[in-house]
Each structure stands twice: as structure tokens, then as C-alpha cells.
Amino acid sequence: MDQITITFPDGKTREYPRGTTGLDIAKGISPSLAKRTVVMALNGTLTDLADPIDDNASIDFVARDDARALELIRHDCAHVLAEAVQSLWPGTQVTIGPTIENGFYYDFFRNEPFTPEDFAAIEKKMREIIARDKPFTKEVWTRDEAKKVFADNGEAFKVELVDAIPEDQTIKIYKQGEWFDLCRGPHMTSTGKIGTAFKLMKVAGAYWRGDSNNPMLTRIYGTAFAKQDDLDAYLHQIEEAEKRDHRKLGRELDLFHFQEEGPGVVFWHAKGWSLFQSLVGYMRRRLAGDYDEVNAPQILDKVLWETSGHWEWYRENMFAAQSAGDDAEDKRWFALKPMNCPGHVQIFKHGLKSYRDLPLRLAEFGVVHRYEPSGAMHGLMRVRGFTQDDAHVFCTEAQLAEECIKINDLILSTYSDFGFEGELTVKLSTRPEKRVGTDEMWDHAERVMATVLSEIKAKGGNRIKTEINPGEGAFYGPKFEYVLRDAIGRDWQCGTTQVDFNLPERFGAFYIDADGAKKAPVMVHRAICGSMERFTGILIEHYAGNFPLWLAPVQVVVTTITSEGDDYAKKVLAALRKAGLRADIDLRNEKINFKVREHSLAKVPALLVVGKKEAESHSVSVRRLGSDGQKVMPTDEAIAALVDEATPPDVKRMRGAA
């Protein structure tokens, strides 16, 4: 019998008969290894343990507590969910049930939609199915056989899915006891390996294949983990996230609102606009001296977007309009800009550029508009009109590494200043199959960025985690993505550094090199916050509305115990505002405890309480948000302390360096 060579994680090899399964190999090594293994990684790809191995391969046995098994726990749980539903409600049709971030879902077709009240019964049935510990077994059916079986079972959606499978692919059926489903796999060895650390989370409506012309399905979302402690931690995070929801806090703190007449665009209230402007002001200070701030038009002729490629590749996401009026010669199509980059190339092209002018760094807080389906919009996190803290660096190839390092340092220090001191991930996405530019250009850019990534890791120490995403770069160049972690452990992708070989050449942008030749610059797209609206939403949730003093829309409120302190309170207010603090006053004839509670709910960081005694001693009673105590201080001393605390971190650094 033919032999194959299997390579193990320690580099050792062993010969086996062709067709040996992963389970056979595991049993031959150790019965305990076979017992704890749920799937194998064959040449790095998770594969059913019972699959025969026909060629030389590397193998790694994956146990249930391995991080790689988590997706399978969730995938298998989705299958158990589907079996439970069909067991409880015969006649329900199952459609698709993929894993998603933090869980899974399954879409069902039933005349009466499911509700959260059904979850208890479904979860009970799921636990019964898991306890039976039925093995997952794979069968390969012919296309006609699969269609006939599903049609006979009244599973019209499955018949459609079989038809959609390419002719060169096999039809795989996975069974768990008597129940079976169409699935690509892989799966763990049995339902018992799923465990009981799962929970159904919510229901939603979803059109079949995402098309509103198709039937409406009921989507049941769930989550599953290897351990109960992990599930409990996740559920706590969800509970905490609901408390911190920026949409809820936006209403409670009077920051912003949305309404039907302006879907996906923000109505900023005074306090919210103050927060937004604090963010913009910070970014402006960080750019001063290194970047030229510019402003490109918001609406431009479609000719420009045709040249950039957006009209061909991004048209469905753009807002376009034809010019008004009856003049036929003036009838032109325009589009609101979805991105700032084409406008910045026009500014670069205006006037001859020499290599001595590079790097040229152009920054803009540009308002862009992109179409998002109404169902995809989510508060500040996903809107149709937003502001980008966009910048584009035009440089030579030799300058690329230094510019990427400078951008990285700016991004990391910015996140630290805003309180994101936890783990941060920097991902390098490399060339996709379809791309512009020569292999030599990509080789150079990827070498540079890989070197930069190593330097980022070395400088960042334990705080920085780095990853490489092969084939995930844009068609016009490799990129870095920055993923920060918030106060409750959620990850947010915000910053990007994107190399672009394409756009300068499309627009014929060039500089004169040292030898007098025209040369296209390397263009680096850079964003730190990304969408300023989204970053504001992240800040709201990160701080749960309890902003540090330098960011708080209202930093301090002066309030009185009785009307005897009104005149003195007004003098204190004037002194606070003269010192540059965002201050307000509360002279209402209400009990002081009522006022304190109200301003605490409004998350005002500092209250200065004054009465007759404070007026006579030129002092204030300082109450801080989250503290039950108070401290009596001379007014000048209290104001000086607040001014120091309200000084933005970047300004403090500049003063310290002066």
C-alpha cells in the first residue's frame, strides 16, 4: 500500500498508509490524545478528524480548549439549534446558520415568527441533544440525491442552496444522529463536545439572501464558549455595553439626535458639538507644524470620479445629483465626495513639485457622504454623512518607511491621550490577487511595511500585538489597520495607513526627481480616528459618559445652597470662564441634594457648591463626580486645580517640553 509522510508540530515525521484518518493517527499516538482531540489542522486548515489523508501533510491535533476550536463549538451549536427548532416545531424550514463574531445565528422560515419567549424551550431541547453526544458524521451525496431528499422533506430553501453550489464542488451532508444538514464543515467529533456554555441572545427579521423581494425569515442569534466563565464574562460585557450605549447616553446627556428627515446624518446639540470640537481641536494641535490643513470641495463633477475609479467601482455608495436649471450646456452630473483623496491629489498637482518639496502632508477634516442601507445604520457608529480626520502624505519610495513610523507614533500617542491604554493590534494586509502596480512595487512596499511592523512591535512592547493578513490589502497597495481595545474589552478598528500606487498615476500627478525626470509620488492615506463621529461614539461608550475633565462638554457647574449665595456664585462663574473653563451655573430654588443628583446624572465632572459661608471666606465646596465627599478650598486654588486638570494631555506635553 502507498505510504504518505505526516509531519507533526515538533518537526518529526512518520510514515502511514495512504487514506489513514486523523483519528487513526491520534489513536496510534495515545488513546488520551484521540479522546481530547475534536478536529485536526491539516496543512494549517481545520479538517474533520475522520477525514482520510491521501497526500503528504503536516498535522496538528486541536483540543476543545484550543482557541482554534471556538468557531467549531459555535458552528456545531448552530446545527444543534436548528435540530432543536425542527424537533419542537415540525415543518419549520432551516436555511443557513453561519458563525459570526462572538457567536452564530440560524435563519428559519415559519409562518409564525419566533420570539425571545421561545428561547427557554429551545435551549432546553439543545441541552438534551448535546447530552446525547451523537457523533457528527459526513456523507457526500450526488446533487440529484440531495435535491430529492430536501424536496421530499419540504426544505425548498435547501434545494435552492444545493443548486447554488458550483458543479465542481461536492455536496456534503453532516449528520448528528437522525438529523442532518447541508454544510461545508468541518465539525467536531460529537455534539457532546459543544458543552453547555451557550445562550440564545436575540431574534431579528432577515430576508432570504438579503433581498426584500424574497420571504422574510426569523434569525435567531446565539453565542457559545468553551467555558462557562468565558460565557459569563461575555454576557457581563454585553450588559455593560447596553448601559454604555452611546445612543442611550446621547439622549440622556443631550449630545445629539437623529430623525427621519435626515437618515444617517447627525443633529449635534450644543454639548455634543462641544465634545466633537474638543476632538477636532486636539487633532488640529497634533498636526500643527507637520501637516498642511486643506479643504477640498464637497461636490465635484462625475468626470473626476470617473478618473479616480470611484464612479465605476463605488457608484452604488455615492450620492449623485444633476445640476439644476434649463441651460443644456450646464447639465452635468455631480457627486458628493465619498472620500477626500481625489481632492488632495488635485491640490498636490496645483503647481510644479520637486523632490525637495517631499514629503508633502495634506490633512483635512473633510465631510464625506456614503450610502448605507437603512438597516445597517447604527447611531454614530455607522452613518451616511461623517467627518474624516483624513490626511495624505505624498513622498518618495525612500521616505515611505520613515513616514509610516511617524504616522504610527502619532496614532499610538493619540489613542493613549484619549484613554485607550490597553492592548492594541496592528495588522499588515498584503497584496490581493487582483491589484495594480508591478510586483517590484509591491515587493518594495511590503518589505518596508514589514520592517516598520517589526519596529512598531519592538517599540510597543507588550501593549502592541501585530498580525499579518495575507491577501487582505487594497488593490492599490498594502495597509496597516489599528485596532484599539476599550474599557470593557471590545475591539474597534479605527486607524489606517494605506499605501497607494494607483491614484497619483490615474490623475497624472508627478514630481521632478533629482535627475530631472518626472516621477509619480507614493501616496499614503492616513486616518487616526477614521470617522470622527464614530470615534466620538466610541469615546462615549469607553467612558460611559464620564469624560475626563479636558473632554467634558460642561466641565464645572457652580450651584448655590440658598439664594444668599447667588451673587458670589456669579463671581465664581465669571472667574471660571475667564480661566478658560466650560462652566455653567445653577441658581434654582431647589434643595442642594436635588441639584447635586441632577448634575451627577448629567455627568458633570465637578460641582462647586457655594453659600453664605463660602462667600464670606472666598472659598468653594468641591464635589467630584462619583465621590460622596466634598472638599472646601479657596476659590483661586480650586480654579487653578481645575484648569490644570482640564489642560489637554498634548498641551501639557508641549508646555513640559518648552
From Swiss-Prot:
Keywords, comma-separated and alphabetical: Aminoacyl-tRNA synthetase, ATP-binding, Cytoplasm, Ligase, Metal-binding, Nucleotide-binding, Protein biosynthesis, RNA-binding, tRNA-binding, Zinc
Quote the SMART domains the UniProt record gives: tRNA_SAD (SM00863)
User: Which chemical reaction does it catalyze?
Assistant: tRNA(Thr) + L-threonine + ATP = L-threonyl-tRNA(Thr) + AMP + diphosphate + H(+)
SUPFAM superfamilies xref list: Class II aaRS ABD-related, Class II aaRS and biotin synthetases, TGS-like, ThrRS/AlaRS common domain
Mind telling me which InterPro entries this protein's record contains?
A: aa-tRNA-synt_IIb, aa-tRNA-synth_II, aa-tRNA-synth_II/BPL/LPL, Anticodon-bd, Anticodon-bd_dom_sf, Beta-grasp_dom_sf, TGS, TGS-like
Using the UniProt record, give the first listed, main subcellular location. Answer: cytoplasm
Keyword Chloroplast on entry: no
Q: How is the cofactor bound?
A: Binds 1 zinc ion per subunit.
Under the heading HAMAP family, the entry gives:
Thr_tRNA_synth
Instruction: Identify this protein by name.
Output: Threonine--tRNA ligase
Organism of this sequence: Rhodopseudomonas palustris (strain ATCC BAA-98 / CGA009)
Q: Which gene encodes it?
A: thrS
